[in-house]
């Protein structure tokens, strides 16, 4: 499962809550969490870019190229996953791993059980949408093709 346009779909209010949650878990709260949240708000709300002599301001979500973007997105997705997995009460895939906005999983669930899980995930947050691929033979993850042949996993990654 891949998040569709993760950086441009995280509403500020939904992203700042997990950021504050994880900052409050630091062993040493220095600088203070409220100060870091205010700085994050400035980055999110005052980000501008110039293109062909015009200046544009990012009004919502995370601007591409922002230094804090990947970490912010990971915290948001980690919090979202944790919350949705706690709330989902039906059978779920045995394996699911994610790298920022790209996920991969494996399961022995029936096709219908898997679709129930995917539909729950798809509808969990109004701004976050996923694309997905279901296959018994192979999937692509992070530009790598992972295949299941004769009971063994194999992978192929084209040369860079």
Each model region followed by its residue ranges:
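Conserved polymerase palm-domain catalytic core
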Residues: 1-120, 124, 133-141, 149
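C-terminal, non-catalytic extensions of nucleic-acid polymerases
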Residues: 147, 151-160
């Amino acid at each position: 499962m891949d998040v569709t346009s993760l950086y441009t779909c995280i509403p500020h209010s939904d992203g700042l809550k997990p950021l504050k949650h994880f900052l409050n878990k630091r062993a040493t709260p220095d600088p203070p969490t409220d100060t870091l949240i205010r700085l994050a708000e400035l980055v999110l709300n005052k980000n501008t870019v110039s293109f062909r002599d015009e200046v544009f301001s990012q009004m919502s979500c995370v601007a591409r190229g922002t230094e804090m973007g990947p970490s912010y997105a990971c915290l948001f997705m980690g919090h979202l996953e944790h919350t949705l997995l706690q709330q989902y009460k039906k059978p779920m895939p045995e394996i699911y791993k994610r790298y920022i906005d790209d996920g991969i999983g494996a399961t022995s669930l029936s096709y219908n059980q898997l679709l129930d899980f995917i539909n729950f995930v798809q509808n969990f947050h109004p701004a976050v949408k996923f694309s997905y691929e279901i296959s018994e033979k192979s999937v692509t993850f992070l530009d790598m093709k992972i295949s299941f042949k004769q009971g063994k996993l194999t992978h192929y990654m084209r040369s860079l």
